[in-house]
Amino acid sequence: MGSCKKNENIKRVTHHFSFKFFSFAFLFFNTLFSHSDPELTTQSIKSPGSYIIHGGPIIPMSNPNRASYHEAIAINKNKIIFVGSRNEAIKRNPNAIEINLKGKTLLPGFIEPHVHPSLAAIILPNKIIAPFEWSLPNGLSQAAQSHSEYMKILSNTVSNHSSLEKVLFSWGYHQLWHGQISRDLLNKVSSKIPLVIIHRSFHEAYLNDKAIQLFNIKKSNFTNHPQVNWEKGHFFEAGFASIIPMLSKHLLEPKRYLRGLAMMSEIIQRNGITTIAEPGFPNINFENELALLKHEMEKKPPYSVYLIPNAARLEIAKKSRRETLEFINSLTKYDTRNIKFLNEQIKLFADGAIYSQAMQVSGGYNNSSEGKWMTPPAYLSDLFRFYWREKFKLHIHANGDKAISHLLELVDESNKAYPRKDHSTTLHHMGYFTDSLAERIKNLGAEASINPYYLWALSDKYTESGLGAQRAQNLVTANSLARRDINFSFHSDFAMAPLSPLTLASTAINRISHRSTKVSQHQRLNSYDALKAITISAAKTLELQDELGSIEVGKMANFVVLNKNPLTFIQSGISSIKVEGTVYQGIYYSNN
Protein backbone atom coordinates (compact mmCIF):
# COMPACT_ATOMS: atom_id res chain seq x y z
CA MET A 1 0.00 0.00 0.00
CA GLY A 2 2.77 2.42 1.01
CA SER A 3 4.58 1.49 -2.17
CA CYS A 4 1.54 2.44 -4.29
CA LYS A 5 1.19 5.85 -2.60
CA LYS A 6 4.88 6.46 -3.06
CA ASN A 7 4.65 5.68 -6.79
CA GLU A 8 1.58 7.88 -7.12
CA ASN A 9 3.38 10.81 -5.46
CA ILE A 10 6.35 10.29 -7.74
CA LYS A 11 4.00 10.39 -10.76
CA ARG A 12 2.40 13.61 -9.51
CA VAL A 13 5.76 15.27 -8.94
CA THR A 14 7.01 14.05 -12.31
CA HIS A 15 3.84 15.26 -14.03
CA HIS A 16 4.04 18.63 -12.28
CA PHE A 17 7.72 18.97 -13.19
CA SER A 18 7.03 17.94 -16.78
CA PHE A 19 4.19 20.47 -17.08
CA LYS A 20 6.32 23.29 -15.69
CA PHE A 21 9.29 22.27 -17.85
CA PHE A 22 7.30 22.19 -21.08
CA SER A 23 5.49 25.41 -20.16
CA PHE A 24 8.85 27.07 -19.53
CA ALA A 25 10.27 25.60 -22.72
CA PHE A 26 7.29 26.83 -24.72
CA LEU A 27 7.59 30.34 -23.32
CA PHE A 28 11.37 30.31 -23.81
CA PHE A 29 11.27 29.21 -27.43
CA ASN A 30 8.26 31.39 -28.18
CA THR A 31 10.16 34.38 -26.80
CA LEU A 32 13.31 33.30 -28.60
CA PHE A 33 11.68 33.06 -31.99
CA SER A 34 9.32 36.01 -31.49
CA HIS A 35 11.94 38.48 -30.32
CA SER A 36 15.47 37.22 -30.84
CA ASP A 37 15.72 35.29 -34.10
CA PRO A 38 18.67 36.98 -35.81
CA GLU A 39 17.55 35.67 -39.20
CA LEU A 40 14.25 37.59 -39.23
CA THR A 41 14.95 40.66 -41.35
CA THR A 42 12.65 42.94 -43.30
CA GLN A 43 12.40 40.17 -45.91
CA SER A 44 10.15 38.39 -43.38
CA ILE A 45 7.45 41.08 -43.48
CA LYS A 46 5.55 39.23 -46.19
CA SER A 47 2.01 39.94 -44.99
CA PRO A 48 0.32 42.45 -42.69
CA GLY A 49 0.85 41.47 -39.07
CA SER A 50 2.35 42.53 -35.77
CA TYR A 51 6.05 43.38 -36.02
CA ILE A 52 8.73 45.13 -33.98
CA ILE A 53 11.48 46.68 -36.12
CA HIS A 54 14.88 47.55 -34.64
CA GLY A 55 18.60 46.98 -35.18
CA GLY A 56 19.50 50.02 -37.26
CA PRO A 57 19.06 53.79 -37.42
CA ILE A 58 15.34 54.64 -37.44
CA ILE A 59 14.89 58.28 -38.45
CA PRO A 60 11.28 59.32 -37.82
CA MET A 61 11.42 62.78 -39.49
CA SER A 62 8.91 63.97 -36.89
CA ASN A 63 11.14 66.67 -35.40
CA PRO A 64 10.81 69.85 -37.49
CA ASN A 65 14.24 71.26 -36.62
CA ARG A 66 16.76 68.48 -36.08
CA ALA A 67 17.35 64.78 -36.56
CA SER A 68 16.23 62.30 -33.92
CA TYR A 69 16.27 58.51 -33.76
CA HIS A 70 14.09 55.70 -32.41
CA GLU A 71 15.53 52.43 -31.15
CA ALA A 72 12.46 50.49 -32.25
CA ILE A 73 8.99 50.82 -33.72
CA ALA A 74 6.01 48.48 -33.68
CA ILE A 75 3.49 48.10 -36.47
CA ASN A 76 0.20 46.25 -36.59
CA LYS A 77 -1.12 45.47 -40.04
CA ASN A 78 -0.74 48.77 -41.95
CA LYS A 79 -0.35 51.23 -39.05
CA ILE A 80 2.42 52.33 -36.70
CA ILE A 81 1.36 51.56 -33.11
CA PHE A 82 4.52 52.33 -31.09
CA VAL A 83 7.80 54.25 -31.30
CA GLY A 84 10.48 54.19 -28.63
CA SER A 85 12.76 51.65 -26.96
CA ARG A 86 13.02 48.01 -27.96
CA ASN A 87 12.27 46.76 -24.44
CA GLU A 88 9.12 48.84 -24.19
CA ALA A 89 8.04 47.72 -27.66
CA ILE A 90 8.37 44.06 -26.60
CA LYS A 91 6.61 44.72 -23.30
CA ARG A 92 3.63 46.31 -25.04
CA ASN A 93 3.54 43.86 -27.95
CA PRO A 94 4.60 40.47 -26.51
CA ASN A 95 3.28 38.50 -29.47
CA ALA A 96 4.88 40.64 -32.17
CA ILE A 97 7.48 39.19 -34.53
CA GLU A 98 10.81 40.95 -34.15
CA ILE A 99 12.53 42.26 -37.29
CA ASN A 100 16.24 43.10 -37.29
CA LEU A 101 17.38 45.83 -39.70
CA LYS A 102 20.95 44.48 -39.48
CA GLY A 103 22.36 48.01 -39.44
CA LYS A 104 20.32 49.31 -42.36
CA THR A 105 18.51 52.65 -42.05
CA LEU A 106 14.73 53.05 -41.87
CA LEU A 107 13.01 56.26 -42.97
CA PRO A 108 9.42 57.14 -43.82
CA GLY A 109 8.60 56.03 -47.36
CA PHE A 110 9.61 58.73 -49.84
CA ILE A 111 6.83 60.93 -51.19
CA GLU A 112 6.90 62.28 -54.75
CA PRO A 113 4.35 65.13 -54.73
CA HIS A 114 4.55 66.07 -58.40
CA VAL A 115 4.84 63.44 -61.09
CA HIS A 116 2.82 62.84 -64.25
CA PRO A 117 2.04 59.16 -64.94
CA SER A 118 0.80 60.08 -68.41
CA LEU A 119 4.15 61.68 -69.31
CA ALA A 120 6.00 58.67 -67.95
CA ALA A 121 3.73 56.34 -69.91
CA ILE A 122 4.41 58.25 -73.13
CA ILE A 123 8.14 58.87 -72.67
CA LEU A 124 9.42 55.59 -71.23
CA PRO A 125 8.42 53.10 -73.97
CA ASN A 126 9.40 55.48 -76.78
CA LYS A 127 12.80 56.64 -77.97
CA ILE A 128 14.67 58.91 -75.56
CA ILE A 129 17.36 61.14 -77.10
CA ALA A 130 18.27 63.65 -74.41
CA PRO A 131 21.39 65.58 -73.39
CA PHE A 132 22.07 63.11 -70.57
CA GLU A 133 21.67 59.38 -70.08
CA TRP A 134 18.52 58.13 -68.39
CA SER A 135 18.50 55.09 -66.15
CA LEU A 136 15.59 52.93 -67.27
CA PRO A 137 14.37 49.46 -66.28
CA ASN A 138 15.74 48.17 -69.58
CA GLY A 139 19.12 49.95 -69.34
CA LEU A 140 20.59 53.37 -70.02
CA SER A 141 19.31 55.62 -72.80
CA GLN A 142 21.93 56.99 -75.18
CA ALA A 143 22.84 60.65 -74.56
CA ALA A 144 23.38 63.21 -77.32
CA GLN A 145 25.48 66.26 -76.50
CA SER A 146 25.57 67.89 -79.94
CA HIS A 147 23.56 68.37 -83.12
CA SER A 148 25.52 65.71 -85.00
CA GLU A 149 25.13 63.17 -82.19
CA TYR A 150 21.41 63.89 -81.98
CA MET A 151 20.82 63.56 -85.73
CA LYS A 152 22.86 60.35 -85.89
CA ILE A 153 20.82 58.66 -83.14
CA LEU A 154 17.54 59.93 -84.62
CA SER A 155 18.46 58.70 -88.11
CA ASN A 156 19.44 55.28 -86.77
CA THR A 157 16.16 55.11 -84.84
CA VAL A 158 14.20 55.90 -88.01
CA SER A 159 16.15 53.24 -89.94
CA ASN A 160 15.18 50.63 -87.35
CA HIS A 161 11.55 51.74 -87.06
CA SER A 162 9.18 48.84 -87.43
CA SER A 163 6.36 50.30 -89.51
CA LEU A 164 5.73 53.19 -91.89
CA GLU A 165 2.25 53.57 -90.40
CA LYS A 166 3.43 53.72 -86.80
CA VAL A 167 4.22 57.15 -85.37
CA LEU A 168 7.76 57.56 -84.11
CA PHE A 169 7.71 59.59 -80.91
CA SER A 170 11.00 60.74 -79.47
CA TRP A 171 11.47 62.79 -76.32
CA GLY A 172 14.48 64.74 -75.03
CA TYR A 173 15.43 67.24 -77.75
CA HIS A 174 16.89 70.53 -76.46
CA GLN A 175 18.10 73.29 -78.76
CA LEU A 176 21.04 74.37 -76.56
CA TRP A 177 22.60 70.93 -76.94
CA HIS A 178 21.14 69.70 -80.21
CA GLY A 179 20.90 72.83 -82.34
CA GLN A 180 17.92 73.89 -84.39
CA ILE A 181 15.53 71.41 -85.95
CA SER A 182 12.54 72.03 -88.18
CA ARG A 183 9.82 70.42 -90.23
CA ASP A 184 12.06 70.51 -93.33
CA LEU A 185 14.92 68.82 -91.47
CA LEU A 186 12.59 66.10 -90.17
CA ASN A 187 11.22 65.57 -93.69
CA LYS A 188 14.78 64.84 -94.80
CA VAL A 189 15.19 62.32 -91.98
CA SER A 190 11.99 60.63 -93.16
CA SER A 191 9.24 61.63 -95.55
CA LYS A 192 7.37 58.35 -95.02
CA ILE A 193 7.34 57.82 -91.24
CA PRO A 194 5.31 60.23 -89.06
CA LEU A 195 7.83 61.91 -86.73
CA VAL A 196 6.92 63.72 -83.52
CA ILE A 197 9.93 65.17 -81.68
CA ILE A 198 8.85 66.15 -78.17
CA HIS A 199 11.02 68.76 -76.49
CA ARG A 200 12.84 68.03 -73.23
CA SER A 201 10.29 70.27 -71.49
CA PHE A 202 7.27 68.33 -72.82
CA HIS A 203 5.84 71.77 -73.56
CA GLU A 204 6.60 71.77 -77.28
CA ALA A 205 7.00 69.49 -80.28
CA TYR A 206 8.21 69.44 -83.88
CA LEU A 207 6.33 67.43 -86.53
CA ASN A 208 7.23 66.43 -90.07
CA ASP A 209 4.78 66.59 -93.00
CA LYS A 210 3.75 62.96 -92.60
CA ALA A 211 2.76 63.50 -88.96
CA ILE A 212 0.87 66.72 -89.74
CA GLN A 213 -1.01 64.85 -92.47
CA LEU A 214 -1.73 61.82 -90.27
CA PHE A 215 -3.11 63.91 -87.41
CA ASN A 216 -5.14 66.07 -89.81
CA ILE A 217 -3.64 69.28 -88.44
CA LYS A 218 -4.83 72.19 -90.61
CA LYS A 219 -2.91 75.40 -91.17
CA SER A 220 -6.18 77.32 -91.16
CA ASN A 221 -6.72 76.35 -87.52
CA PHE A 222 -3.49 78.07 -86.49
CA THR A 223 -3.48 81.27 -88.52
CA ASN A 224 -1.67 83.93 -86.49
CA HIS A 225 -1.43 81.63 -83.48
CA PRO A 226 1.28 83.21 -81.29
CA GLN A 227 2.59 79.84 -80.10
CA VAL A 228 2.75 77.98 -83.40
CA ASN A 229 5.39 78.28 -86.14
CA TRP A 230 3.65 76.49 -89.00
CA GLU A 231 6.59 76.59 -91.41
CA LYS A 232 8.87 74.92 -88.85
CA GLY A 233 6.21 72.44 -87.73
CA HIS A 234 6.80 73.82 -84.23
CA PHE A 235 3.99 73.80 -81.66
CA PHE A 236 4.78 75.18 -78.20
CA GLU A 237 2.97 75.95 -74.92
CA ALA A 238 -0.70 76.66 -75.81
CA GLY A 239 0.02 75.64 -79.40
CA PHE A 240 1.30 72.26 -78.24
CA ALA A 241 -1.70 71.90 -75.91
CA SER A 242 -3.96 72.56 -78.91
CA ILE A 243 -2.67 69.58 -80.90
CA ILE A 244 -2.55 67.13 -77.98
CA PRO A 245 -6.18 66.00 -78.56
CA MET A 246 -5.28 65.25 -82.19
CA LEU A 247 -2.33 63.13 -81.06
CA SER A 248 -4.21 61.46 -78.20
CA LYS A 249 -5.23 58.32 -80.09
CA HIS A 250 -1.55 57.51 -80.63
CA LEU A 251 -0.20 58.91 -77.35
CA LEU A 252 -2.73 56.87 -75.36
CA GLU A 253 -2.42 53.68 -77.42
CA PRO A 254 -3.14 51.16 -74.61
CA LYS A 255 -0.48 48.52 -75.17
CA ARG A 256 2.45 50.94 -75.35
CA TYR A 257 1.01 53.29 -72.71
CA LEU A 258 0.53 50.45 -70.21
CA ARG A 259 4.08 49.29 -70.85
CA GLY A 260 5.20 52.80 -69.92
CA LEU A 261 3.15 52.78 -66.70
CA ALA A 262 4.65 49.42 -65.73
CA MET A 263 8.14 50.86 -66.27
CA MET A 264 7.18 53.84 -64.12
CA SER A 265 6.03 51.53 -61.31
CA GLU A 266 9.34 49.71 -61.42
CA ILE A 267 11.28 53.00 -61.18
CA ILE A 268 9.07 54.17 -58.29
CA GLN A 269 9.74 51.04 -56.25
CA ARG A 270 13.45 51.03 -57.09
CA ASN A 271 13.81 54.55 -55.68
CA GLY A 272 12.01 54.06 -52.37
CA ILE A 273 8.82 55.94 -53.18
CA THR A 274 5.60 54.79 -51.50
CA THR A 275 3.37 57.76 -52.44
CA ILE A 276 3.07 59.80 -55.62
CA ALA A 277 0.77 62.65 -56.57
CA GLU A 278 -0.16 64.15 -59.90
CA PRO A 279 -1.09 67.82 -59.71
CA GLY A 280 -3.01 68.50 -62.91
CA PHE A 281 -5.07 65.45 -63.82
CA PRO A 282 -5.86 64.83 -66.61
CA ASN A 283 -3.20 65.89 -69.07
CA ILE A 284 -5.04 64.69 -72.16
CA ASN A 285 -8.30 62.79 -71.57
CA PHE A 286 -9.91 62.12 -68.18
CA GLU A 287 -11.67 58.83 -68.91
CA ASN A 288 -8.84 57.23 -70.88
CA GLU A 289 -6.05 58.29 -68.53
CA LEU A 290 -7.98 57.15 -65.45
CA ALA A 291 -8.90 53.79 -66.99
CA LEU A 292 -5.29 53.08 -67.97
CA LEU A 293 -3.98 54.20 -64.57
CA LYS A 294 -6.51 51.94 -62.83
CA HIS A 295 -5.35 49.04 -64.98
CA GLU A 296 -1.78 49.52 -63.72
CA MET A 297 -2.79 50.04 -60.10
CA GLU A 298 -4.97 46.91 -60.09
CA LYS A 299 -1.65 45.03 -60.16
CA LYS A 300 -1.16 46.40 -56.60
CA PRO A 301 2.28 47.99 -56.96
CA PRO A 302 3.72 49.15 -53.61
CA TYR A 303 2.68 52.79 -53.77
CA SER A 304 -0.42 54.99 -53.68
CA VAL A 305 -1.48 57.63 -56.20
CA TYR A 306 -3.16 60.92 -55.31
CA LEU A 307 -4.67 63.07 -58.04
CA ILE A 308 -5.28 66.83 -58.10
CA PRO A 309 -7.68 68.06 -60.82
CA ASN A 310 -6.51 70.21 -63.73
CA ALA A 311 -8.83 73.24 -63.62
CA ALA A 312 -8.30 74.58 -67.15
CA ARG A 313 -8.29 71.19 -68.89
CA LEU A 314 -11.52 70.14 -67.16
CA GLU A 315 -13.16 73.49 -67.87
CA ILE A 316 -12.44 73.07 -71.58
CA ALA A 317 -14.02 69.59 -71.45
CA LYS A 318 -17.04 70.59 -69.35
CA LYS A 319 -17.69 73.93 -71.10
CA SER A 320 -18.87 75.83 -68.00
CA ARG A 321 -17.19 76.84 -64.73
CA ARG A 322 -20.09 75.65 -62.54
CA GLU A 323 -20.35 72.29 -64.28
CA THR A 324 -16.59 71.90 -63.87
CA LEU A 325 -16.83 72.67 -60.15
CA GLU A 326 -19.65 70.15 -59.67
CA PHE A 327 -17.59 67.51 -61.46
CA ILE A 328 -14.48 68.28 -59.40
CA ASN A 329 -16.47 68.06 -56.17
CA SER A 330 -17.71 64.60 -57.21
CA LEU A 331 -14.30 63.13 -58.09
CA THR A 332 -13.90 61.07 -54.91
CA LYS A 333 -16.48 58.66 -56.35
CA TYR A 334 -13.68 57.45 -58.64
CA ASP A 335 -11.42 56.57 -55.69
CA THR A 336 -10.02 53.05 -55.44
CA ARG A 337 -7.89 51.30 -52.83
CA ASN A 338 -4.73 52.95 -54.15
CA ILE A 339 -5.92 55.87 -56.31
CA LYS A 340 -7.50 58.84 -54.57
CA PHE A 341 -8.52 62.33 -55.60
CA LEU A 342 -7.47 65.01 -53.12
CA ASN A 343 -10.56 66.87 -52.03
CA GLU A 344 -10.68 70.66 -52.43
CA GLN A 345 -7.30 70.91 -54.13
CA ILE A 346 -6.81 72.25 -57.66
CA LYS A 347 -3.97 72.79 -60.16
CA LEU A 348 -3.41 75.91 -62.26
CA PHE A 349 -0.62 76.82 -64.70
CA ALA A 350 1.15 80.17 -65.02
CA ASP A 351 4.25 80.63 -67.19
CA GLY A 352 6.11 78.48 -69.69
CA ALA A 353 8.73 75.80 -69.15
CA ILE A 354 12.18 76.47 -67.74
CA TYR A 355 13.62 73.82 -70.09
CA SER A 356 12.27 75.80 -73.06
CA GLN A 357 13.56 79.12 -71.71
CA ALA A 358 9.90 80.13 -71.77
CA MET A 359 9.52 80.93 -68.07
CA GLN A 360 8.65 84.53 -67.31
CA VAL A 361 11.73 86.26 -65.89
CA SER A 362 11.70 89.93 -64.95
CA GLY A 363 15.02 90.72 -66.64
CA GLY A 364 14.23 88.87 -69.87
CA TYR A 365 16.74 86.64 -71.69
CA ASN A 366 20.11 87.53 -73.20
CA ASN A 367 19.41 85.47 -76.34
CA SER A 368 16.38 85.16 -78.63
CA SER A 369 14.26 83.33 -76.01
CA GLU A 370 11.05 84.92 -74.81
CA GLY A 371 8.91 84.27 -71.76
CA LYS A 372 5.53 82.66 -72.44
CA TRP A 373 2.32 82.20 -70.49
CA MET A 374 0.75 78.74 -70.43
CA THR A 375 -2.43 80.40 -69.21
CA PRO A 376 -3.12 84.01 -70.26
CA PRO A 377 -2.72 86.18 -67.14
CA ALA A 378 -6.31 87.48 -67.17
CA TYR A 379 -7.75 83.96 -67.38
CA LEU A 380 -5.26 82.69 -64.79
CA SER A 381 -6.32 85.47 -62.40
CA ASP A 382 -9.98 84.64 -62.98
CA LEU A 383 -9.42 80.94 -62.24
CA PHE A 384 -7.32 81.74 -59.19
CA ARG A 385 -9.91 84.06 -57.65
CA PHE A 386 -12.74 81.62 -58.30
CA TYR A 387 -11.08 78.63 -56.62
CA TRP A 388 -9.76 80.82 -53.81
CA ARG A 389 -13.34 81.87 -53.00
CA GLU A 390 -14.39 78.22 -53.16
CA LYS A 391 -11.73 77.55 -50.48
CA PHE A 392 -9.61 75.20 -52.54
CA LYS A 393 -5.93 74.70 -51.89
CA LEU A 394 -4.28 76.05 -55.03
CA HIS A 395 -1.25 74.39 -56.61
CA ILE A 396 0.23 76.58 -59.36
CA HIS A 397 2.92 75.79 -61.92
CA ALA A 398 5.23 78.82 -61.75
CA ASN A 399 8.83 78.90 -62.94
CA GLY A 400 10.19 82.42 -63.29
CA ASP A 401 10.37 85.30 -60.83
CA LYS A 402 7.98 87.42 -62.91
CA ALA A 403 5.30 84.70 -62.83
CA ILE A 404 5.90 84.04 -59.13
CA SER A 405 5.53 87.76 -58.38
CA HIS A 406 2.25 87.86 -60.33
CA LEU A 407 0.88 84.93 -58.33
CA LEU A 408 1.93 86.41 -55.00
CA GLU A 409 0.03 89.58 -55.95
CA LEU A 410 -3.03 87.37 -56.51
CA VAL A 411 -2.56 85.68 -53.13
CA ASP A 412 -2.27 89.04 -51.39
CA GLU A 413 -5.23 90.59 -53.20
CA SER A 414 -7.45 87.51 -52.74
CA ASN A 415 -6.62 87.16 -49.07
CA LYS A 416 -7.59 90.77 -48.44
CA ALA A 417 -10.90 90.34 -50.25
CA TYR A 418 -11.67 86.83 -48.90
CA PRO A 419 -9.42 86.17 -45.90
CA ARG A 420 -8.19 82.60 -45.43
CA LYS A 421 -5.93 81.79 -42.50
CA ASP A 422 -4.36 78.50 -43.66
CA HIS A 423 -4.65 78.62 -47.45
CA SER A 424 -1.19 76.99 -48.00
CA THR A 425 -1.16 78.06 -51.66
CA THR A 426 1.72 76.10 -53.17
CA LEU A 427 3.94 77.30 -56.00
CA HIS A 428 5.39 74.43 -58.03
CA HIS A 429 8.82 74.30 -59.73
CA MET A 430 10.11 77.83 -58.92
CA GLY A 431 13.08 77.63 -61.26
CA TYR A 432 14.29 81.15 -60.56
CA PHE A 433 13.26 83.38 -57.67
CA THR A 434 14.94 85.95 -55.45
CA ASP A 435 15.42 86.30 -51.72
CA SER A 436 12.84 89.08 -51.61
CA LEU A 437 10.27 86.78 -53.23
CA ALA A 438 11.05 84.11 -50.65
CA GLU A 439 10.31 86.71 -47.97
CA ARG A 440 6.96 87.50 -49.61
CA ILE A 441 6.11 83.80 -49.79
CA LYS A 442 6.75 83.56 -46.05
CA ASN A 443 4.73 86.67 -45.20
CA LEU A 444 1.76 85.60 -47.32
CA GLY A 445 1.58 82.09 -45.86
CA ALA A 446 2.35 80.36 -49.15
CA GLU A 447 4.42 77.20 -49.65
CA ALA A 448 6.61 75.65 -52.33
CA SER A 449 7.28 72.42 -54.16
CA ILE A 450 10.52 72.76 -56.09
CA ASN A 451 12.67 70.87 -58.56
CA PRO A 452 16.33 71.23 -57.49
CA TYR A 453 17.49 69.20 -60.50
CA TYR A 454 17.16 72.28 -62.73
CA LEU A 455 20.40 73.54 -61.22
CA TRP A 456 22.34 70.37 -62.11
CA ALA A 457 20.93 70.10 -65.63
CA LEU A 458 20.70 73.73 -66.76
CA SER A 459 23.04 75.99 -64.80
CA ASP A 460 26.06 75.66 -67.11
CA LYS A 461 24.17 76.03 -70.39
CA TYR A 462 21.96 78.85 -69.13
CA THR A 463 25.04 80.70 -67.90
CA GLU A 464 26.32 80.61 -71.49
CA SER A 465 22.99 81.44 -73.14
CA GLY A 466 19.74 82.74 -71.76
CA LEU A 467 20.11 83.86 -68.17
CA GLY A 468 23.75 84.73 -67.58
CA ALA A 469 25.83 83.66 -64.60
CA GLN A 470 24.09 85.59 -61.83
CA ARG A 471 20.68 84.03 -62.46
CA ALA A 472 21.69 80.66 -63.91
CA GLN A 473 23.91 79.89 -60.93
CA ASN A 474 21.12 80.77 -58.51
CA LEU A 475 18.40 78.50 -59.81
CA VAL A 476 16.10 76.89 -57.22
CA THR A 477 17.62 78.55 -54.15
CA ALA A 478 16.14 76.15 -51.62
CA ASN A 479 18.03 77.51 -48.63
CA SER A 480 16.23 80.84 -49.04
CA LEU A 481 13.07 78.90 -48.22
CA ALA A 482 14.60 76.77 -45.46
CA ARG A 483 16.01 79.78 -43.60
CA ARG A 484 12.51 81.23 -43.41
CA ASP A 485 10.84 78.00 -42.26
CA ILE A 486 8.69 77.92 -45.39
CA ASN A 487 7.31 74.45 -46.03
CA PHE A 488 8.83 73.12 -49.26
CA SER A 489 9.05 69.74 -50.90
CA PHE A 490 11.13 68.30 -53.74
CA HIS A 491 9.61 66.79 -56.85
CA SER A 492 10.82 65.37 -60.14
CA ASP A 493 7.89 66.47 -62.33
CA PHE A 494 8.97 63.32 -64.14
CA ALA A 495 10.59 63.42 -66.59
CA MET A 496 11.89 66.89 -65.81
CA ALA A 497 14.18 65.14 -63.32
CA PRO A 498 14.89 61.49 -62.52
CA LEU A 499 12.17 59.84 -60.44
CA SER A 500 14.67 59.55 -57.58
CA PRO A 501 14.16 61.49 -54.32
CA LEU A 502 17.73 60.83 -53.19
CA THR A 503 19.02 62.38 -56.43
CA LEU A 504 16.92 65.48 -55.80
CA ALA A 505 18.13 65.67 -52.20
CA SER A 506 21.75 65.26 -53.28
CA THR A 507 21.42 68.06 -55.84
CA ALA A 508 20.07 70.46 -53.23
CA ILE A 509 22.69 69.45 -50.66
CA ASN A 510 25.69 69.80 -52.99
CA ARG A 511 24.60 72.36 -55.63
CA ILE A 512 26.98 71.07 -58.27
CA SER A 513 26.18 71.26 -61.99
CA HIS A 514 26.56 68.48 -64.53
CA ARG A 515 30.01 69.86 -65.41
CA SER A 516 30.98 69.56 -61.73
CA THR A 517 30.80 73.32 -61.26
CA LYS A 518 30.12 74.34 -57.66
CA VAL A 519 27.54 77.12 -57.70
CA SER A 520 25.90 79.35 -55.05
CA GLN A 521 27.26 77.23 -52.20
CA HIS A 522 25.56 79.50 -49.63
CA GLN A 523 22.28 78.00 -50.89
CA ARG A 524 23.25 74.43 -50.01
CA LEU A 525 20.78 72.60 -47.79
CA ASN A 526 21.74 70.52 -44.80
CA SER A 527 20.95 66.81 -45.11
CA TYR A 528 18.06 66.86 -42.65
CA ASP A 529 16.19 69.66 -44.44
CA ALA A 530 16.72 67.81 -47.73
CA LEU A 531 15.25 64.62 -46.24
CA LYS A 532 12.28 66.59 -44.91
CA ALA A 533 11.60 67.73 -48.48
CA ILE A 534 11.07 64.12 -49.62
CA THR A 535 9.15 62.94 -46.53
CA ILE A 536 7.16 65.04 -44.05
CA SER A 537 7.29 68.33 -45.97
CA ALA A 538 6.17 66.52 -49.12
CA ALA A 539 3.23 65.11 -47.16
CA LYS A 540 2.36 68.67 -46.09
CA THR A 541 2.40 69.78 -49.73
CA LEU A 542 -0.48 67.36 -50.28
CA GLU A 543 -2.12 68.03 -46.87
CA LEU A 544 -1.47 64.38 -45.96
CA GLN A 545 0.85 65.10 -43.03
CA ASP A 546 -1.56 63.45 -40.56
CA GLU A 547 -1.30 60.14 -42.44
CA LEU A 548 2.11 60.04 -44.09
CA GLY A 549 5.62 61.45 -44.12
CA SER A 550 6.95 60.58 -40.67
CA ILE A 551 7.24 57.59 -38.36
CA GLU A 552 4.66 58.39 -35.70
CA VAL A 553 1.93 56.44 -33.92
CA GLY A 554 -1.25 56.26 -35.99
CA LYS A 555 0.41 56.90 -39.33
CA MET A 556 0.66 54.51 -42.25
CA ALA A 557 3.37 51.84 -42.07
CA ASN A 558 5.15 53.09 -45.19
CA PHE A 559 8.95 52.99 -44.97
CA VAL A 560 12.08 52.94 -47.09
CA VAL A 561 15.09 50.80 -46.14
CA LEU A 562 18.51 52.21 -47.13
CA ASN A 563 21.92 50.56 -46.95
CA LYS A 564 23.45 53.77 -45.53
CA ASN A 565 22.31 56.53 -43.20
CA PRO A 566 21.99 59.69 -45.35
CA LEU A 567 22.53 61.88 -42.29
CA THR A 568 26.00 60.46 -41.64
CA PHE A 569 27.04 59.34 -45.13
CA ILE A 570 29.35 61.56 -47.16
CA GLN A 571 27.16 64.29 -48.65
CA SER A 572 28.60 64.08 -52.14
CA GLY A 573 27.58 60.42 -52.32
CA ILE A 574 24.00 60.57 -51.09
CA SER A 575 22.55 59.83 -54.52
CA SER A 576 24.54 56.56 -54.56
CA ILE A 577 22.90 55.20 -51.39
CA LYS A 578 21.15 51.97 -52.25
CA VAL A 579 17.43 51.57 -51.68
CA GLU A 580 17.18 48.02 -50.31
CA GLY A 581 13.39 48.02 -50.45
CA THR A 582 10.21 49.57 -49.14
CA VAL A 583 7.52 48.71 -46.64
CA TYR A 584 4.16 49.69 -48.10
CA GLN A 585 1.12 49.44 -45.86
CA GLY A 586 2.88 46.94 -43.62
CA ILE A 587 4.37 44.65 -46.31
CA TYR A 588 8.03 44.61 -47.39
CA TYR A 589 8.97 44.82 -51.08
CA SER A 590 12.60 44.06 -51.80
CA ASN A 591 14.72 45.61 -54.53
CA ASN A 592 17.21 42.75 -54.34
Model-flagged regions — what are they?
Residues 296-298, 331-338, 418-420, 441-445:
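Acidic (Asp/Glu)-rich catalytic clusters
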Residues 301-346, 424-435, 461-487:
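Phosphate/diphosphate-binding loops
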Residues 34-36:
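Boundary at the C-terminal end of the N-terminal hydrophobic targeting segment
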Residues 339-358, 446-456:
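Non-cysteine beta-strand/loop elements that form the S-adenosyl-L-methionine
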Residues 1-17:
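N-terminal secretory signal peptides that target proteins for export/translocation
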Residues 39-40, 44-54, 60, 65-324, ...:
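Divalent metal-binding segments
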Residues 20-31:
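Bacterial N-terminal signal peptides
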Residues 259, 385-395, 399-425, 429-430, ...:
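His/Asp/Glu-enriched, well-ordered alpha-helical/loop segment
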